[in-house]
Curated annotation (Swiss-Prot):
The modification Glycine amide is found at G10. The gene is gnrh3. The lineage of its organism: Eukaryota, Metazoa, Chordata, Craniata, Vertebrata. It comes from Oncorhynchus keta. GO terms for molecular function: hormone activity. This is Gonadoliberin-3. GO terms for cellular component: extracellular region. Its main location: secreted. It comes from the Eukaryota.
Length: 10
């Protein structure tokens, strides 16, 4: 599962 938390690239 690929997700991003605003200022955290992921």
């Amino acid at each position: 599962q690929h997700w991003s938390y605003g200022w955290l690239p992921g």
